[in-house]
């Protein structure tokens, strides 16, 4: 699912990182203080748009310093906010779908799968993973542009907990958009998902991803 700033994001070889979930009063100097110890900073771009959660791009002279910054600051508690720090993913193709998650090849897939509907326009796979891992370890997450998402859990009991406890819960994207989402089993077509205009049948799931899937190793912190 693309966001309002998807066209500003680049690849990971230029030393640039994305910093999200920043406090509303953040300044460029604050970002410099957060990241200077990882290496020489070439540029800081702070995006503080009215009514949205601020985010920024920080560019290091050495791409290896960018990797260190991600390792050291992703998930870091900064004031009342937990930072999200990652490489900007390259967007391309019609519709702006992401290509090439940094997490590498599939580490594990699971049959313990749920579908999610009602995601806000700026909701990303990372937002979905963060929300749904309240039920347990997520090994796969993906989204598409019509507000649908798919999540796979490592354990059946976590999937069952998500179906019971995360259905009709308030979801918040990295840009501050909120909505109440529905969570249901993959083979269900509940909650108004409409079939394509072609009238095609025979699919086990109403979900069809148009972008690269995103895998998560249960042995790495996110």
Curated annotation (Swiss-Prot):
Q: Which UniProt keywords apply?
A: Isopeptide bond, mRNA processing, mRNA splicing, Nucleus, Phosphoprotein, Repeat, Repressor, RNA-binding, Ubl conjugation
- Kindly list the positions at which Phosphotyrosine occurs in this protein: 193, 215
Identify the domain of life. Eukaryota
Name the segments for region: Interaction with SAFB1.
Answer: 189-201
Compartments, record wording: Nucleus
Gene3D superfamilies given in the database record: 3.30.70.330
Biased-composition ranges, Low complexity, are: 190-199
Its chief place of residence is: nucleus
Protein's name in the database: Serine/arginine-rich splicing factor 9
**What protein family is recorded?**
Belongs to the splicing factor SR family.
Residue(s) carrying Phosphoserine: 190, 194, 196, 205, 209, 212, 217
- Quaternary structure and partners: Interacts with KHDRBS3/SLM-2. Interacts with HABP4. Interacts with NOL3/ARC/NOP30, NSEP1/YB-1/YB1, SAFB/SAFB1, SRSF6/SFRS6, TRA2B/SFRS10 and C1QBP. Interacts with RBMY; the interaction inhibits SRSF9 pre-mRNA splicing. May also interact with DUSP11/PIR1.
* InterPro entries to which the protein is assigned, alphabetical: Nucleotide-bd_a/b_plait_sf, RBD_domain_sf, RRM_dom, RRT5_SRSF_SR, SRSF9_RRM1, SRSF9_RRM2
